[in-house]
């Protein structure tokens, strides 16, 4: 059987979602590890006055591509940016570009999707379902297409506790939903959304399940594979450890925890934190397309790209390692010292929200007003709480994913491909990964230099001293209030003070005796 780089040699690849986190890493890995690929057509829309070519050039200039620039300086020649709008009819392709794609494409990687959990249903259906269907229809016209690779999510069927590597029946017929959305106004769509999505937590999950069914039905005559990653996190190894460039998912929470803003979160300490590194998802996608292209299986291949069943990690452990990392290597200008309390108790959660989030933010905004600055902390806390609401479903529940196809795929790789396209998450050391992840948010998301660590540590020590001083004053005030009114409290106070004095006297005497 040919190796993965040999399979992609001379191939023309069509990639959607190249401006997204996963798409960027896939593009880099494909060009670096399969250097003899012929060309990569990247579907990109114009945005903010930038042409598709300018947007692609901006991506290629990022640190993510530093290693590729060193190993293959001419890689840009293989990338062809094509103006396309996935939400428009026929993907808004020009006739010339369409003809080139139809004649040349060998493998499609469909990574584009709206990942906003609070997206309204109409927009989520447009990008996640209708755009996928239009891409399938385009793929059916391609003369040399070998594989259609669709990236979904492991949570598409989160209404089930055990999820196999199959496409389940959809909650509603996608065609009927699309037809209905054409005549419904936005108000009606918003009203019926909760009933439609049912026991799924958001429109993203709901529409990704519909998209899988569309791929299965509309792409029945194509050679299709589906990869379902769980919570995609920073890179494990490639192109270097800890690469992350966004606030999505756990990244934003890690940063908020490191800044001392996030103090409590509704989560179960024992719930599985099914994080999967982005490079594992990319390697799985490239390997899955290779397997389908070489073996042409009779049925659609689905791969649950998860970690919980083979290398379990829990949210309580995530919290411990994140806080430990940011205490050793703090973020600059932290609001408070990092400390997070996870709880699944409703009343306790709201108590900590009031005491640890809203009260300090309110007092800090008063301080900002008094010093002539614009208050901002309550707005930050409000945004944080909205993000927490969307994520608490995933931090409070656990699922079991079957990974037989992933295990089969891993066994099909030759020894060299197992190293180059590593998908064996049993080798993943979680403590090291979380530390690299946290440092990645510091370096690549917040753009903080490691040379600033001494100052950041000094600032954290200052916050610690302020906290100890505040707590000491608070205890003294409380005791003084009780002492003034209660003889018993006064006796206890004098007893504690005398005990401390005796202890200090004994310690001083014993120290003197040693000399």
UniProtKB/Swiss-Prot annotation:
It is found in: Peroxisome membrane. Keywords: Lipid biosynthesis, Lipid metabolism, Membrane, NADP, Oxidoreductase, Peroxisome, Transmembrane, Transmembrane helix. Residues 484-515 are peroxisomal. Optimum pH is 7.4. Gene3D superfamilies: NAD(P)-binding Rossmann-like Domain (3.40.50.720). It is a single-pass membrane protein. PANTHER family: FATTY ACYL-COA REDUCTASE 1 (PTHR11011:SF119), MALE STERILITY PROTEIN 2-RELATED (PTHR11011). This is Fatty acyl-CoA reductase 1.
